[in-house]
UniProtKB/Swiss-Prot annotation:
Gene3D superfamilies: Aldolase class I. CDD domains: TIM. Substrate binds at residues 12-14, 175, 214, 235-236. GO terms for cellular component: cytosol. Its EC number is 5.3.1.1. It is an enzyme of class 5 (isomerase). One of its GO terms (molecular function) is triose-phosphate isomerase activity. This is Triosephosphate isomerase. PANTHER family: TRIOSEPHOSPHATE ISOMERASE. It is found in: Cytoplasm. It comes from the Bacteria. One of its GO terms (biological process) is glycolytic process. Keywords: Cytoplasm, Gluconeogenesis, Glycolysis, Isomerase.
Length: 251
């Protein structure tokens, strides 16, 4: 973790959660005071829960609410899609774009991710841009090449530390229980940092780089201690308040 960059623990609930899940979110709000000295907290529930969760954070609660995806357009004939403006109106402060599951399940290209990041800014949201390699790409020794291409095309000009966060998520580690070694994470996050600095100068030096991929309480402290790891994008472990807060305590 880079000391001068305040870490962010972002929970991605994916396609999980019904109205009854509000109890877990309320438990996160109740326990957030214990970790506010260590990290910022963000929870990205499914769109059906976004407004209700955002309402619970009114009055300056220590957990922000975000979204998992947005359409590039502000409105129009796009059945089933949700615009960044709608997310902001519902109370979101950030939105994940380019998650590997969106790239794989919906064929989203780097160009589409770029457009969605710009849409997030248009609505006043922070864009959390995800990048990462598959197992096949890793085995072929292509990890850094893949990341360079994704970062080059997915990150818009105008990216700043206050409007964009990069999340490195090795696809082979998501939901598998597998994680790269601390040494691997350090190498890759250092590579990402250097690319950000070359392109965005001082802003690139200050951008948060999150690690995502089977982050859990048992490995959080080790991962958060790695240089240039400025927090985590947490999947399954963010569904339980106790696990989510324990990960934040590892910062």
């Amino acid at each position: 973790m880079t000391d001068r960059i305040r870490p962010l623990i972002a929970g991605n609930w994916k396609m999980n959660g019904l109205k009854a899940s509000a109890a877990e979110f309320e438990a996160m709000l109740a326990g957030a005071a214990e970790v506010t000295g260590k990290a910022d907290l963000l929870v990205c529930p499914p769109a059906t829960l976004l407004a209700a969760f955002a309402e619970k954070t009114r009055g300056g609660k220590a957990v922000a609410v975000g979204a998992q995806d947005c359409h590039a357009k502000a409105s129009g004939a796009h059945t089933g899609d949700i615009s960044a403006e709608m997310l902001a109106d519902a109370g979101a402060s950030a939105v994940i774009v380019g998650h590997s599951e969106r790239r794989a399940d919906h064929g989203e290209s780097d160009v589409v991710v770029h457009q969605k990041a710009e849409a997030a800014w248009r609505a006043g949201l922070v864009a959390i841009v995800c990048v990462g390699e598959t197992q096949q790409q890793r085995d072929a020794g292509l990890t850094l090449e893949i990341l360079r291409g994704q970062l080059t095309l997915s990150l818009p000009e105008g990216s700043r530390a206050d409007n964009l966060i990069v999340a490195y998520e090795p696809v082979w580690a998501i939901g598998t229980g597998l994680t790269p070694t601390a040494g691997d994470v350090e190498q890759i996050h250092s590579f990402i940092r250097q690319l950000l600095i070359v392109r965005f100068k001082e802003q690139g030096a200050r951008m948060r780089i999150l690690y995502g991929g089977s982050v859990k309480p048992s490995n959080a402290a080790e991962l958060m201690a790695v240089a240039n790891v400025n927090g985590a994008l947490v999947g399954g472990a963010s569904l339980k308040a106790a696990d989510f807060l324990a990960i934040a305590k590892g910062c």
